[in-house]
């Protein structure tokens, strides 16, 4: 935990190229994910009527972009998993296989131009070169454009004791304050948000390269974090102790059970 920028993160990382250059999870195999993508497109289309072009970072098989394409938007995806990017391209969802960063953003600007909307859903907290990604977003977004960042919300992790979400693929655990601090550093300013059911409680935070009037609900969320002391190390320390107590209670329960024990895990 950094007391200056209020970011919570893992103390060690695994190289992103090792983790994501070949990936197994494909968005299109989940009916829930497909329906959510449809709603996501409808919501952004209604909120930001001036949008004509969309770029998605970590676009996977293009399930989300497919919905935008149906509605006539110019689209482009970027995904580090070559096997999945290949699948998306076969389905005519133009996808660049690679890791998005500042250098790639410069190439995209030449070939695609500046998009009106840049989307990064559940990816920003997963990579160690996070500053280069945000620099790339700032370099690429239209001056009147919108950036939509979806992430598992720190408050939901703490409230639900969701320590199962803390592992090597998830490096950062953002609050509204911490991710806003990061983007503000590179000239992107939060102005609104929506709740998301993904990952057990996420938010979609909207940024602009221009300082816009904050929505009332965003101001309320800022005040909520202050009241809950979400960006206080003591809050995180208490969460850590609760996780350990929960683990100990579960171990005790399992050890006291008689007979066979069956486990089932799902993602």
Region roles according to the model:
Residues 188-199:
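Conserved S-adenosyl-L-methionine
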Residues 122-126:
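A short His-aromatic
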Residues 1, 6-87, 162, 167, ...:
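Extended interfacial segments that mediate partner engagement and assembly in macromolecular machines
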Residues 131-146:
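A short glycine-rich, Lys/Arg-flanked "PGG" loop and its adjoining helix->strand segment in the class I
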Residues 119:
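A conserved beta-strand element that flanks and buttresses the S-adenosyl-L-methionine
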């Amino acid at each position: 935990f950094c007391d200056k920028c209020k970011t919570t993160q893992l103390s060690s990382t695994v190289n992103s190229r090792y983790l994501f250059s070949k990936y197994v999870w494909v968005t299109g195999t989940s009916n829930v994910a497909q329906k959510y993508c449809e709603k996501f497109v409808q919501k952004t289309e209604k909120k930001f009527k001036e949008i004509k072009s969309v770029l998605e970072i970590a676009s996977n098989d293009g399930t989300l972009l497919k919905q935008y394409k149906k509605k006539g938007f110019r689209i482009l995806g970027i995904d580090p998993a070559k096997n999945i990017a290949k699948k998306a391209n076969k389905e005519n969802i133009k996808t660049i296989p690679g890791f998005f960063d500042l250098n790639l953003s410069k190439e995209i600007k030449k070939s695609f131009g500046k998009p009106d909307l840049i989307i990064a859903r559940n990816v920003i907290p997963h990579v160690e070169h996070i500053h280069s990604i945000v620099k790339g977003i700032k370099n690429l977004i239209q001056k009147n454009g919108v950036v939509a960042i979806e992430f598992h919300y720190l408050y939901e992790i703490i409230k639900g004791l969701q320590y199962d979400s803390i592992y090597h693929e998830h490096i950062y655990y953002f609050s509204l304050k911490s991710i806003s601090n990061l983007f503000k550093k590179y000239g992107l300013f939060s102005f609104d948000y929506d709740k998301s059911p993904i990952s057990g409680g996420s938010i979609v935070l909207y940024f602009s390269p221009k300082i816009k009037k904050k929505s009332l609900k965003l101001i309320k969320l800022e005040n909520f974090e202050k009241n809950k002391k979400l960006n206080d190390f003591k809050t995180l320390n208490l969460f850590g102790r609760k996780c350990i107590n929960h683990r100990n209670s579960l171990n005790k329960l399992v050890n006291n059970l008689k007979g066979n024990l069956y486990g089932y895990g799902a993602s």
